[in-house]
């Protein structure tokens, strides 16, 4: 897989971030550092580590519950507009719009149960 970021952006709704939940954050940091040479930087949220060199924005964090899975985040212009559109198309809201230092996010579930996030920059 070529990671030179030569792929064109079609419509601006790109995968812009991913998160990997961990039962043991330090252990997974060691794993991904050894496997992919990823470098980590402490995030602004406690227990959150930004992945610095994974091609796109990524994070490693402490699991909030045993069922928590990896999540991709798609960039959108407006959380409210896309949450509404997703609900009209049969999506469920897992987590309403949240604000963090860099922007806003919400977590949704598609009609077949797949969880994904949407992201709006500040």
What are these regions (language model features)?
Residues 61, 107, 118-122:
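Short beta->alpha transition motifs characteristic of CBS
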Residues 1-29, 70-74, 122:
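N-terminal beta-strand motif that seeds the catalytic metal site of vicinal oxygen chelate
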Residues 56-59, 114-116:
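Short, charged/polar, Gly/Pro-enriched secondary-structure boundary elements
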Residues 12-57, 102:
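Core segments of cupin and vicinal oxygen chelate
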Residues 51-54, 108-111, 121:
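Active-site beta-strand termini and strand-to-loop segments that position acidic
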Residues 14-23, 64-89, 105-109:
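Vicinal oxygen chelate
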Residues 93, 98-109:
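C-terminal structural segments of small proteins and small subunits
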Residues 31-32, 86, 113:
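Conserved active-site tyrosine of GNAT-family acetyltransferases
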